[in-house]
Amino acid sequence: ELEKEFQKQKYLSTPDRLDLAQSLGLTQLQVKTWYQNRRMKWKKMVLKGGQEAPTKPKGRPKKNSIPTSEEIEAEEKLNSQVQSQELREPSQGLEGLCDTQEPKARVVPVEVAESPGQAQELPVTSPEPPPSS
């Protein structure tokens, strides 16, 4: 029954999902999950040259419907442009902090003569790596 409905309609509205779940004795979550899994399987088949072509969802349109791949790509492109702009132009508030902050001290284990075999951690402020022994 789920497979028949899927062939007719790739996306279910909430009322359709509720009706189908009740008619099959399943929960809405079970039907929703089955449809999500089945759509993924269907999309893989389509991409590998299956016989069906992707179609737009039928039934009642929703205000917050699932975006198309074109909408997703456009949004990702917009987000990447915004991120690259932020990298080139850091916000005003952070610039002042960078100039005045001192480098953070690194904690490096140092051997101490009074306690052989035990390392004592001391802060080191120089940017050079610790000498290798």
UniProtKB/Swiss-Prot annotation:
Q: Which SUPFAM superfamilies has this protein been placed in? A: Homeodomain-like
InterPro entries per record: HD, HD_metazoa, Homeobox_CS, Homeobox_TF, Homeodomain-like_sf, HTH_motif
User: What is its subcellular localisation?
Assistant: Nucleus
Q: Which residues bind DNA?
A: 1-46
Where is this chain primarily localised? nucleus
Please provide the record's keywords in A-Z order: DNA-binding, Homeobox, Nucleus, Transcription, Transcription regulation
Q: Name one GO cellular component term.
A: nucleus
Q: In which tissues is it expressed?
A: Expressed in keratinizing epithelia such as wool follicle, tongue and esophagus. Expressed at low level in thymus. Not detected in spleen, skeletal muscle, brain, heart kidney, liver and lung.
**Pfam families hit by this protein:** Homeodomain
> Does the record bear Transcription in its keywords?
yes
Q: Which GO terms describe its molecular function?
A: DNA binding; DNA-binding transcription factor activity, RNA polymerase II-specific
Domain of life, per lineage? Eukaryota
Q: Where is this region: Disordered?
A: 45-133
> Is Nucleus among the key words of this record?
yes
Q: What does this protein do?
A: Transcription factor. Binds optimally to the DNA consensus sequence 5'-YYTAATGRTTTTY-3'. May control the expression of neural adhesion molecules such as L1 or Ng-CAM during embryonic development of both the central and peripherical nervous system. May be involved in controlling adhesive processes in keratinizing epithelia.
User: What family does the database annotate?
Assistant: Belongs to the BAR homeobox family.
Official protein name in the record: Homeobox protein BarH-like 2
Q: Which gene encodes it?
A: BARX2
